[in-house]
A protein has these predicted regions:
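Selected alpha-helical membrane-embedding segments in polytopic membrane proteins
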Residues: 25, 29-151
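Short, membrane-interfacial amphipathic segments enriched in basic
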Residues: 9-25, 94, 132
Length: 228
């Protein structure tokens, strides 16, 4: 299987912490170096551990357990399922064991995202002349983009603890608190996570290097897919 060779400085690949900082501060040159020696396991494990440890630390507190119960209640109501006092009390009683499992499951989802998106990208984007990236290169780009999701959890966890809620900690709606919560615009902004958009931008920058396509075009396409 042929791989794309990207011209960059002939320096050894930076350490994992330096790559993480580079993804945040200088994503394009960092990704240009990453795709020359694509690795994805270390960064995927590291970001998973960060996200999982923060979610679990929150889930074992009284505030965290109650926040998870409230989240479950909102999810059931969103699907039109009523919840009486007995069922709510049962959820509270089981929260000590279920909240950590829910937190761990949420962290595992972030591990699956790069694989799912990588598979989709391989199907949707045809290699251009002179650009035939391998699956490993695509996966390396998307896995390093998960640094943004780890940073998201670093920000969201203390906010969730203060607000005693898991909802809308890093969404656009937080920037416009004057909006009526029941308005269509508020509901739309409540579903747009700033860090997910950042993740898309970082991923698109890396994919633009691999597939030699305009980054803006990829950002627009991926953002549209996210919003839809």
């Amino acid at each position: 299987m042929s791989c794309l060779h990207v011209s960059s400085r002939s320096l050894p690949l930076d350490s994992l912490p330096r790559r993480g900082v580079g993804i945040i501060s200088r994503p394009r040159p960092t990704l240009a170096r990453i795709v020359t020696t694509p690795t994805w396991v270390p960064v995927l494990v590291a970001t998973f551990l960060i996200i999982a440890s923060l979610l679990l630390a929150f889930a074992v507190t009284d505030v965290g357990r109650q926040a998870f119960v409230d989240q479950w209640e909102r999810s059931r109501l969103a699907f039109g399922q009523s919840l009486d006092d007995t069922e709510y009390a049962r959820m509270e009683a089981r929260s000590a064991s279920l909240a950590p499992l829910y937190a761990l499951g949420s962290a595992l989802v972030t591990v699956l995202i790069p694989f799912i998106v990588a598979g989709t990208v391989r199907l949707a984007l045809r290699p251009t002349e002179g650009a035939t990236p391998s699956f490993g290169q695509v996966l390396a780009v998307l896995s390093h983009a998960n640094v943004v999701l780890a940073l998201r959890q670093v920000v969201a966890t203390p906010v969730a603890f203060v607000r005693e809620s898991l909802s809308s900690a890093t969404t656009v709606v937080q920037l416009v608190p004057s909006l009526d919560e029941t308005s269509p615009l508020a509901r739309f902004f409540g579903g747009v996570d700033l860090f997910v958009v950042w993740w898309i931008v970082v991923a698109a920058l890396g994919l633009s290097i691999l597939y030699r396509r305009p980054a803006r075009q990829l950002v627009a396409s991926m953002t549209l897919a996210y919003l839809v």
